[in-house]
Amino acid sequence: MATSIGVSFSVGDGVPEAEKNAGEPENTYILRPVFQQRFRPSVVKDCIHAVLKEELANAEYSPEEMPQLTKHLSENIKDKLKEMGFDRYKMVVQVVIGEQRGEGVFMASRCFWDADTDNYTHDVFMNDSLFCVVAAFGCFYY
């Protein structure tokens, strides 16, 4: 009675492509983000929750489809976070999907980062067939 769990990571640097190619170099001496552009866990969690409700509301667990779904979710969430204006943040989105069988799952993450600028949030979605845990990490790019 084996359980299959899909895991996907998606990494982005938080800067829209249009701004990267603007031709003007970005200041590298900025050591702290502007207050309005700091990674805000509560806002990010609301964004993640909305995406999960939309994408997984009627989803059924299928081991063959889960790798593609985890990749799609991680990229979709990463793209939504980029649109939120967290300039100079590298976004890491981790998505874990597993079959809902009434068993428990323990998950943990460890990071080495700057506690003044970097942060994370997570959200859990469950239905009768599956569970999904999403963790989003925002690391300021110096």
Swiss-Prot record:
One of its GO terms (cellular component) is cytoplasm. Pfam families: Tctex-1. One of its GO terms (molecular function) is dynein intermediate chain binding. One of its GO terms (biological process) is regulation of cilium assembly. The keyword Cytoplasm applies. It is found in: Dynein axonemal particle. Keywords: Ciliopathy, Cytoplasm, Disease variant. PANTHER family: DYNEIN LIGHT CHAIN TCTEX-TYPE PROTEIN 2B, T-COMPLEX-ASSOCIATED-TESTIS-EXPRESSED 1/ DYNEIN LIGHT CHAIN. It is linked to Short-rib thoracic dysplasia 17 with or without polydactyly: A form of short-rib thoracic dysplasia, a group of autosomal recessive ciliopathies that are characterized by a constricted thoracic cage, short ribs, shortened tubular bones, and a 'trident' appearance of the acetabular roof. Polydactyly is variably present. Non-skeletal involvement can include cleft lip/palate as well as anomalies of major organs such as the brain, eye, heart, kidneys, liver, pancreas, intestines, and genitalia. Light chain of the cytoplasmic dynein complex 2, a multisubunit complex composed at least of eleven different proteins. The cytoplasmic dynein 2 complex consists of two catalytic heavy chains (HCs) and a number of non-catalytic subunits presented by intermediate chains (ICs), light intermediate chains (LICs) and light chains (LCs). Acts as one of several non-catalytic accessory components of the cytoplasmic dynein 2 complex (dynein-2 complex), a motor protein complex that drives the movement of cargos along microtubules within cilia and flagella in concert with the intraflagellar transport (IFT) system. Required for proper retrograde ciliary transport. Belongs to the dynein light chain Tctex-type family. This is Dynein light chain Tctex-type protein 2B.
